[in-house]
C-alpha cells in the first residue's frame, strides 16, 4: 500500500481497489514493515507457516494476503467469508474478493464454546491456538488466544474495541486473568513489533 514506505495515493487506491476505501484507510506501511518483511527479518517465511489465521476480512486485515499466500493455508470463519461475499455492496467493497484470489483460503466453523458468544475454534485441537468469536465489528470477528504449556496466554483481540458490550466484557475479563501475559488490540499505536515467549 505504501511503496518504499512512502505514501502514494495511486498505489493505495490500486491496492484497495476502491476510491471510497482510500478515503477511510490512508495507511503508510513503513519500509521493511510489511508482514512478510518483518518475519523475514526473523528468519521466517510464509512457506514455513502451518496457517495464517484471519480475525476478519476488512481491508486493513486482508489486503496483504498475497504477501503470505505461500502459507500452507489461510483460515477464516465460514460466516465471515459468507458475509463478505453475499453481504451488502458495502461489505463486498470493504472485503474485496481480489485480496483473497490466488490464496489457499479455507474456512472453519465453531468447535468449542469459549467466549461471551459461546463460539470458538480450536485450531489444532490442543487448546494452544483458539479463535474466539467476539462479534460486533463484523459478524465473524475473532480474537486469538495463544496458550503456552504452562497455561500463560496472550490474547490478540483484533478489532475487538469495536465489538459488542458482551465481547468487550469478555476481553476485559481475559486481560485481568492472572495467566494473561498480554492483551493486544489492533490499531494501538503504542504496540510495537516484538516477540512474546510463552
Spans of features found by a protein language model:
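Catalytic core of the metallo-beta-lactamase
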Residues: 1-10, 107-160
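Active-site metal-binding motif and surrounding structural segment of the metallo-beta-lactamase
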Residues: 15-20, 24-75
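Cap/insert and terminal regions of metallo-dependent hydrolase folds
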Residues: 23-37, 145, 149-198
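Active-site environment of divalent metal-dependent phosphoester hydrolases
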Residues: 57-63, 138-142, 184, 188-193
Amino acid at each position: 500500500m505504501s511503496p518504499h514506505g512512502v505514501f502514494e495515493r495511486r498505489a493505495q487506491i490500486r491496492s484497495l481497489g476502491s476510491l471510497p476505501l482510500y478515503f477511510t484507510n490512508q495507511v503508510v506501511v513503513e519500509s521493511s514493515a510489511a508482514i512478510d518483511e518483518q518475519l523475514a527479518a526473523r528468519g521466517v517465511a510464509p512457506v514455513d507457516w502451518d496457517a495464517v489465521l484471519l480475525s476478519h476480512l476488512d481491508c486493513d486485515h486482508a489486503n496483504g494476503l498475497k504477501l503470505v499466500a505461500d502459507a500452507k493455508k489461510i483460515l477464516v470463519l465460514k460466516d465471515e467469508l459468507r458475509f463478505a461475499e453475499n453481504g451488502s455492496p458495502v461489505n463486498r467493497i470493504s472485503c474485496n474478493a481480489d485480496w483473497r484470489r490466488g490464496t489457499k483460503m479455507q474456512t472453519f466453523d465453531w468447535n468449542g464454546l469459549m467466549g461471551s458468544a459461546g463460539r470458538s475454534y480450536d485450531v489444532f485441537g490442543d487448546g494452544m491456538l483458539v479463535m474466539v468469536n467476539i462479534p460486533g465489528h463484523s459478524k465473524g470477528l475473532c480474537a486469538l488466544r495463544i496458550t503456552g504449556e504452562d497455561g500463560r496466554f496472550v490474547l490478540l483481540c483484533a478489532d475487538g474495541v469495536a465489538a459488542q458490550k458482551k465481547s468487550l466484557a469478555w476481553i476485559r475479563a481475559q486481560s485481568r486473568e492472572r495467566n494473561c501475559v498480554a492483551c493486544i488490540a489492533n490499531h494501538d499505536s503504542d504496540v510495537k513489533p516484538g516477540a512474546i515467549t510463552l
